[in-house]
Amino acid sequence: RGGVEQGFYSDMKSDEDWMFGRGWFGRYYEPAIMDYRSDIETGYLALVLRGGLFYLVPYVAILILSFFNGYFRSRNLFCKSFAILCLMQVVNLYPYGWPAFNFYHFVVWVGVWVCNSKKFRRLDNIQIAEYCF
């Protein structure tokens, strides 16, 4: 994967590429295969390719804020579990973890909602069980 990342870094030369990315269908030149690629295996670089730092930074900030709210400001295991899932998504951005339209990422964004909702954070474990189940 190191060669793929090096190809990405060498092709993303301008500040505009890093700030705004190359769009949803953006591509970068990969010297190892002598062709342009539209995806990269590393999650945070995939976000940079699509929308630049203006896409990556808010994405990570929302997930980290959700982790802190859900883990440290909640009174129940429901929020704490979603908070850990949000943190795992941030950690997972390095080895792979780029956003996709699938059930896992749907659950992550439900977790963002739950962790940032005072309504859920104020409930204790018994109230969560009554409310959800």
Predicted regions and their residues:
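Long extracytoplasmic/lumenal interhelical loops at the membrane interface
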Residues: R1-G51
